[in-house]
Swiss-Prot record:
Compartment(s): Cell membrane
PTM comment, free text: Cleavage by metalloprotease ADAM8 in the extracellular part generates 2 soluble forms (125 kDa and 165 kDa) in vitro and is inhibited by metalloprotease inhibitors. Cleaved by BACE1.
Identification of the protein by name: Neural cell adhesion molecule L1-like protein
Gene Ontology CC terms: apical part of cell; dendrite; extracellular exosome; membrane; neuron projection; plasma membrane
Organism: Homo sapiens (Human)
Motif position, FIG[AQ]Y: 1181-1185
Length: 1208
């Protein structure tokens, strides 16, 4: 594949070079030459709507040409001051101002120098007038219902194209159909009018897009009078009009669109059909439009000329019209005259041929004048050629060939330059070239020489010119070196020589390494809907890396750059990824590399695997009572061999429509003999399997029905259902419909006591259950069940042992003792129940126990029975998870499949003391530079008499080392806090607290805190403020500093604050202002009013709290929930609020401005004096051992606030 692509790229490059090398001779601008027009306006220029219009004419030549114009064949001078000529060209502009209609006409540009004159084609400049409908009074039209009528439009003339519309005054289009039609001229035809056609606002609009103009005809009124007798009539052509006769001629230019239209009046409305007389309408280019009234043929050719017939018909008759179509063509070049360069004394021919219909006439001009005015000795002028002999420099001229017929004129200029000059090499000296090893190199040496010159190439270090099959020199001087090697690198010289002189240039050639590619993985096999990942590894010459571009294609079609199908295909440079591959993604993938000098490619074959197609054409043969042959045809395997076939059947009377697997067949086989059961109406289907998965099932086969037979098997799983004592309910698995083998299925059940010398009892039933009464409880029986149907009995059944129904145990176990293992675990032992008193199959023993009272406080406990079962025959069991230091009652009973027997007499035992649980909380409520005060809550479960606490602490500064653990035994169990002294300043400590009983200490609760620094000023304390006070003076040591003020109740739990604020004191220069205000009478009165109101609110608050009023805990929990506090909430004594984790509702800014919402803010209570009583949620006093909160701020339903003006 790679050589193929390389070769293809080489061919394209060679074709480009050949076109480059075979172009017309380009005379260097330094050589004298006749003028050549290189740019001109279109042959028709319409008046534009821009600020000016421009007619272009540009030419080249040596000497520089001068320009002149003619208008309508007469010289045109730029005398009008509005004309703006361009420098160095013949282009001029006319501003769009004033009256410019006199500029309309046909212009021609002439470019001349001393050697000749070139002329442009005629440029028609059109200044259209603004089209208008004439102002006229249009008489109303009145017709009878069913009559035909034509509404004329007669649009004004204007610059084409013209678009005509019929609308009403509301600019709604008049609906056209088989009855109503607008002709190409714009007239509106009615084949027969109806009453609904009456209206007074039929308006014809003419639109001229190039003029950006739409004009409207005066509205027309049409009245349709209803008629009681509408006469039907045969068709009559209205278009073409009657005066044109039964046939007409139309001339159309080749390549244009032919439109033939036919419209007939009549009632019922005639239908129009088209045909070509003596031929067929051109397929693919003809269409019938406007309900068949218009025949449209696009891109008309000479084959379309001839006679076309339209036929309008209804059931009363027909009307026809023939169109004779003539196809003509404006002139077009078949041999356009070509410019040429000749040397003195040479000969030449100038050819000019054109075709058209009618045949164009040819006229020759020399320098814009008829050729007859410029006779040259030896020249022969024919209608289609001029023959030159012994050319001389004075033959240099511009020859014009003009071809014309009735449809237009075309003009071509051909320069004849007679010059003698030594070679002029156009390629720059010292040009650098590069190619790739194995590719061809092209070294250019473009030149101009007259007379003709000889070109030779040689390597700079060599004397002889290059020769051999690897070298080729083109006519324009380019050297081609085929199949380059590294030895071809170097400098080359190009020599060009003619009769007048010799010239040379040098060129340098570099040889690069070829680009290489490798696509991986090679030929992958990908399951459908998996991901395909291809990688393209490239290697190229270091000089070419900047130009290296990779692209991907599939089966020769390139992928888009950014992928397709909503990102399913992603191309990222060298990587191609396709998600959810489908069978359409299978193919040959090619990675192509292109550099500035070469290209390379590599391919990989991607195979997509899928499940097979379903098998087809299922056929049944060799039909037998117990077998049939099934044959099928394999479907497509989708690139993965079929490993096996699964044959399924449907025929189960119990589950119709359910398919079951019958057998499996190896993938190479497509036929199998299927074993069948009697009395089944079978239908089969086949599923193919390959490594990807299963196919869809095939279409079902024909039905095959087998005859009935006696049962082949007996019921299985014979058992006893739970039943009453002295009763045996025998059950078994009934035979499925596929196992019954025939109609009338029944079951013969026989039984007898096991080992008893009695006859078998027997009963036949149709269902799969039989109830048998027995004289004994839980006695063994031999039981047999046999299947029978109308065709006979099944095989002899095997006997099974079943037991009659159980009864409850009638004796309770006797408890021998309860051994206490520890405070929460005991071992119970009992005597087993005799087998004959179990009355069934013993399943185990059950222990019931319940707590009667706590030994800690002596309170009785409501009976809540706990149950623990032990399976099997045993006489002891362990009872865990008991409460320590408590009294329990315990009973034991036996149970079988029927149920539980009687309980034993209750056994009373007590559990000893255990270790307590951890305290409910531990917090540091006060800290200084060398002391700390800790407070804690009572454990939720004491598990005995509390003897005290073990407090431990150690230094845990932010290092890997920790300090020595210090122990403090607190022997006062009622003490809820402890004051530590002799701590280090600015040090972080970790505290551990355990509650203890006589059995030891429980799990610790921990807390961390840091002491203050040496320079800390601590907390300023204020003496008590009574309820009637509204202000209190505070001495401030630093005027202008911020101070935190918190107001607390004296005896509330944890010294909860009811107000806090951050206040900035002023400097001393403002002290007088506050002194003066405080002595004013109005200020004293205001403060008294505020104090009275505050006292009233606080009194209400305290009364509500003492009466158990609830404050909004839920509201505060919703503001800032704390998951850690929430998890602990249910484990503490009683209820408590975590509102200390949230700011007080209605309070001002936080004490610590940097504190996060979920952090706890320190309260002044941490630094308060003495112990503080605790309140429960309802505000009542609990005492030292009541449930407590870690931190809290009390919120009442109507919270009070207080202000504290400071005086500096």
């Amino acid at each position: 594949m790679e050589p193929l692509l390389l070769g293809r790229g080489l061919i394209v490059y060679l074709m480009f070079l050949l076109l480059k090398f075979s172009k017309a001779i380009e005379i260097p601008s330094s050589v004298q030459q006749v003028p050549t027009i290189i740019k001109q306006s279109k042959v028709q220029v319409a008046f534009p709507f821009d600020e000016y219009f421009q007619i272009e004419c540009e030419a080249k030549g040596n000497p520089e040409p001068t320009f002149s114009w003619t208008k309508d064949g007469n010289p045109f001078y730029f005398t009008d001051h509005r004309i703006i000529p361009s420098n160095n060209s013949g282009t001029f502009r006319i501003p769009n101002e004033g009256h410019i209609s006199h500029f309309q006409g046909k212009y021609r540009c002439f470019a001349s120098n001393k050697l000749g004159i070139a002329m442009s084609e005629e440029i028609e400049f059109i200044v259209p007038s603004v089209p208008k409908f004439p102002k006229e009074k249009i008489d109303p039209l009145e017709v009878e219902e069913g009559d035909p009528i034509v509404l004329p439009c007669n649009p004004p003339k204007g610059l084409p194209p013209l678009h005509i519309y019929w609308m009403n005054i509301e600019l709604e289009h008049i609906e056209q159909d088989e009855r109503v039609y607008m002709s190409q001229k714009g007239d509106l035809y009615f084949a027969n009018v109806e009453e609904k056609d009456s209206r007074n606002d039929y308006c014809c609009f003419a639109a001229f897009p190039r003029l950006r103009t739409i004009v409207q005809k005066m509205p027309m009124k049409l009245t349709v009078n209803s008629s009681n007798s509408i006469k039907q009539r045969k068709p009559k052509l209205l278009l073409p009009p009657t005066e044109s006769g039964s046939e007409s001629s139309i001339t159309i230019l080749k390549g244009e669109i032919l439109l033939l239209e036919c419209f007939a009046e009549g009632l019922p409305t005639p239908q129009v059909d088209w045909n070509k007389i003596g031929g067929d309408l051109p397929k693919g280019r003809e269409t019938k439009e406007n309900y068949g009234k218009t025949l449209k043929i696009e891109n008309v050719s000479y084959q379309d000329k001839g006679n076309y017939r339209c036929t309008a018909s209804n059931f009363l008759g027909t009307a026809t019209h023939d169109f004779h179509v003539i196809v003509e063509e404006p002139p077009r070049w078949t041999k356009k005259p070509q410019s040429a360069v000749y040397s003195t004394g040479s000969n030449g021919i100038l050819l000019c041929e054109a075709e058209g219909e009618p045949q164009p006439t040819i006229k020759w001009r020399v320098n814009g004048s008829p050729v007859d005015n410029h006779p040259f000795a030896g020249d022969v002028v024919f209608p289609r050629e001029i023959s030159f002999t012994n050319l001389q420099p004075n033959h240099t001229a511009v020859y014009q060939c003009e071809a014309s017929n009735v449809h237009g004129t075309i003009l071509a200029n051909a320069n004849i330059d007679v010059v003698d000059v030594r070679p002029l090499i156009q390629t720059k000296d010292g040009e650098n070239y590069a190619t790739v090893v194995g590719y061809s190199a092209f070294l250019h040496c473009e030149f101009f020489a007259s007379p003709e010159a000889v070109v030779s190439w040689q390597k700079v270090e060599e004397v002889k010119p290059l020769e051999g099959r690897r070298y080729h020199i083109y006519e324009n001087g380019t050297l081609q070196i085929n199949r380059t090697t590294e030895e071809d690198a170097g400098s080359y010289s190009c020599w060009v020589e003619n009769a007048i002189g010799k010239t040379a240039v040098t060129a340098n050639l570099d040889i690069r390494n070829a680009t290489k590619l490798r696509v991986s993985p090679k030929n992958p096999r990908i399951p459908k809907l998996h991901m395909l990942e291809l990688h393209c590894e490239s290697k190229c010459d270091s000089h070419l890396k900047h130009s290296l571009k990779l692209s991907w294609s599939k089966d020769g079609e390139a992928f888009e750059i950014n992928g397709t199908e909503d990102g399913r295909i992603i191309i990222d440079g060298a990587n191609l990824t396709i998600s959810n591959v489908t069978l359409e993604d299978q193919g040959i993938y090619c990675c192509s590399a292109h550099t500035a000098l070469d290209s390379a490619a590599d391919i990989t074959q991607v195979t997509v695997l899928d499940v097979p197609d379903p098998p087809e054409n299922l056929h049944l043969s060799e039909r037998q009572n117990r077998s049939v042959r099934l044959t099928w045809e394999a479907g497509a395997d989708h690139n993965s061999n079929i490993s096996e076939y699964i044959v399924e059947f449907e025929g189960n009377k119990e589950e119709p429509g359910r398919w079951e697997e019958l057998t499996r067949v190896q993938g190479k086989k497509t036929t199998v003999i299927l074993p069948l059961a009697p009395f089944v109406r079978y239908q089969f289907r086949v599923i193919a399997v390959n490594e990807v998965g299963r196919s869809q099932p095939s279409q079902p086969s024909d039905h095959h029905e087998t005859p009935p037979a006696a049962p082949d098997r007996n019921p299985q799983n014979i058992r006893v259902q739970a039943s009453q004592p002295k009763e045996m309910i025998i059950k078994w698995e009934p035979l499925k419909s596929m196992e019954q083998n025939g109609p009338g299925l029944e079951y013969r059940v026989t039984w007898k006591p096991q080992g008893a010398p009695v006859e078998w009892e027997e009963e036949t039933v149709t269902n799969h259950t039989l109830r048998v009464m027995t004289p004994a409880v839980y006695a063994p029986y031999d039981v047999k069940v046999q299947a029978i149907n109308q065709l006979g009995s099944g095989p002899d059944p095997q006997s099974v042992t079943l037991y009659s129904g159980e009864d409850y145990p009638d004796t309770a176990p006797v408890i021998h003792g309860v051994d206490v293992i520890n405070s929460t675990l005991v071992k119970v032992t009992w005597s087993t129940v005799p087998k004959d008193r179990v009355h069934g199959r013993l399943k185990g023993y059950q222990i019931n126990w319940w707590k009667t009272k706590s030994l800690l406080d002596g309170r009785t406990h409501p009976k809540e029975v706990n149950i623990l079962r032990f399976s099997g025959q045993r006489n002891s069991g362990m009872v865990p998870s008991l409460d320590a230091f408590s009294e329990f009652h315990l009973t034991v009973l036996a149970y079988n499949s029927k149920g539980a027997g009687p309980e034993s007499e209750p056994y009373i035992f007590q559990t000893p003391e255990g270790v307590p649980e951890q305290p409910t909380f531990l917090k540091v409520i006060k800290v200084d530079k060398d002391t700390a005060t800790l407070s804690w809550g009572l454990p939720k479960k004491l598990n005995g008499n509390l003897t005290g606490y073990l407090l431990q602490y150690q230094i845990i500064n932010d290092t890997y080392e920790i300090g020595e653990l210090n122990d403090i035994n607190i022997t006062t169990p009622s003490k809820p806090s402890w004051h530590l002294s002799n701590l280090n300043a600015t040090t972080k400590y970790k505290f551990y607290l355990r509650a203890c009983t006589s059995q030891g200490c429980g799990k610790p609760i921990t807390e961390e805190s840091s002491t203050l620094g040496e320079g800390s000023k601590g907390i300023g304390k204020i003496s008590g403020v009574n309820l009637t006070q509204k202000t209190h003076p505070i001495e401030v040591f630093e005027p202008g500093a911020e101070h935190i003020v918190r107001l607390m109740t004296k005896n509330w739990g944890d010294n909860d604050s009811i107000f806090q604020d951050v206040i900035e004191t002023r400097g001393r220069e403002y002290a007088g202002l506050y002194d003066d205000i405080s002595t004013q009478g109005w200020f004293i009165g205001l403060m008294c009013a505020i104090a009275l109101l505050t006292l009233l609110l606080l009194t209400v608050c305290f009364v509500k709290r003492n009466r158990g009023g609830k404050y909004s805990v839920k509201e505060k929990e919703d503001l800032h929930p704390d998951p850690e506090i929430q998890s602990v909430k249910d484990e503490t004594f009683g209820e408590y609020s975590d509102s200390d984790e949230k700011p007080l509702k209605g309070s001002l800014r936080s004490l610590n401005r940097d504190m996060q919402p979920t952090e706890s803010a320190d309260s002044l209570v941490e630094y308060g004096e003495g112990d503080h009583g605790l309140f429960s949620e309802d505000g009542s006093f609990i005492g030292a051992y009541a449930g407590s909160k870690e931190k809290g701020s009390v919120e009442s339903n109507g919270s009070s606030t207080a202000t504290f003006p400071l005086r500096a």
